[in-house]
């Protein structure tokens, strides 16, 4: 299809998605094919220029994503970096991930979308995205288009050579950013190893490496963060993956910050959400927000396990 014609169509899709109306199956298919072409050119450590606004987990909370854009600025006016976990748990995973992918295809230089541990075939079959696709489309094709696309998402991003952004955390198999650049990311998230760790690990108060209670990834202490940042010339590791009640949380003597962008997570946790604005000198400020007023919830039949991934 002619590029101009596609762009016009894409703008109509984005308009529709902004009203929380899903695309057709065939539209999703062509969107995902286009997105693959763009993402395949991106690095495992995708370079991003400031100013940029960094966001954590969204988890299918579509109306809260709208609130995020209201507070942080519309795309493409604001340059965005999302650190994964677009789907599962919330009621609108389909609309949420479709919108973010559509914005990526339309404004590729102004939005970066990384992979989270929920951007996986296995996890989405347990925590809601698979069932939602089935319910909204009557088959699993859309789930397949998206989960195939997830394999192409960059694992990490580097803002102006200084702020390292990723979903989960560090890995005992990785000392340098070059180690990450050398990984083959075009696969389902493995159960162990460096790629798994980047999407699953958590910072901890205890020093060194520890066994993660999540059953994947590791816990890592302040000594690990400091060593990693120093070795790679970084000032900060910015990550998501954990519910924090204020929406953001510093740890490891400000070597690590956690950002969580799903307010009142799972519609019951009572937390605030936050995003981190980095200006053109890399000065940061946090914007906190509460849930957007919601319409009536769709009826969801299956109750998912209560484990916070």
Swiss-Prot record:
GO molecular function: any one? RNA polymerase II CTD heptapeptide repeat S2 phosphatase activity
Which of this chain's residues are annotated to bind Mn(2+) 1?
57, 59, 85
UniProt key word ATP-binding: no
A Pfam family name for this chain?
Answer: Metallophos
Looking at its record, which EC class is this enzyme? hydrolase
Per the record, the GO terms for biological process are:
intracellular signal transduction; meiotic cell cycle; mesoderm development; mitotic cell cycle; negative regulation of canonical Wnt signaling pathway; negative regulation of epithelial to mesenchymal transition; negative regulation of glycolytic process through fructose-6-phosphate; negative regulation of hippo signaling
Q: How's its activity regulated?
A: Inhibited by the interaction between PPP2R2A and ARPP19; this inhibition is enhanced when ARPP19 is phosphorylated. Inhibited by the interaction between PPP2R2A and PABIR1/FAM122A.
| Keywords of this entry | Centromere, Chromosome, Cytoplasm, Cytoskeleton, Disease variant, Hydrolase, Intellectual disability, Iron, Manganese, Meiosis, Metal-binding, Methylation, Nucleus, Phosphoprotein, Protein phosphatase, Ubl conjugation, Zinc
Q: Which Gene3D superfamilies does the entry mention?
A: 3.60.21.10
Reactions the enzyme catalyzes: O-phospho-L-seryl-[protein] + H2O = L-seryl-[protein] + phosphate; O-phospho-L-threonyl-[protein] + H2O = L-threonyl-[protein] + phosphate
In terms of InterPro entries, this protein maps to:
Calcineurin-like_PHP_ApaH, Metallo-depent_PP-like, PPA2-like, Ser/Thr-sp_prot-phosphatase
Modification sites for Leucine methyl ester:
309
Question: Where is Zn(2+) bound in this sequence?
Answer: 57, 59, 85
Q: Which cofactor does it need?
A: Mn(2+); Fe(3+); Zn(2+)
Residues that coordinate or bind Fe(3+): 85, 117, 167, 241
Mod. after translation: Reversibly methyl esterified on Leu-309 by leucine carboxyl methyltransferase 1 (LCMT1) and protein phosphatase methylesterase 1 (PPME1). Carboxyl methylation influences the affinity of the catalytic subunit for the different regulatory subunits, thereby modulating the PP2A holoenzyme's substrate specificity, enzyme activity and cellular localization.
Similarity-based family: Belongs to the PPP phosphatase family. PP-1 subfamily.
Q: Its function?
A: Catalytic subunit of protein phosphatase 2A (PP2A), a serine/threonine phosphatase involved in the regulation of a wide variety of enzymes, signal transduction pathways, and cellular events. PP2A is the major phosphatase for microtubule-associated proteins (MAPs). PP2A can modulate the activity of phosphorylase B kinase casein kinase 2, mitogen-stimulated S6 kinase, and MAP-2 kinase. Cooperates with SGO2 to protect centromeric cohesin from separase-mediated cleavage in oocytes specifically during meiosis I.
Protein name from the UniProt record? Serine/threonine-protein phosphatase 2A catalytic subunit alpha isoform
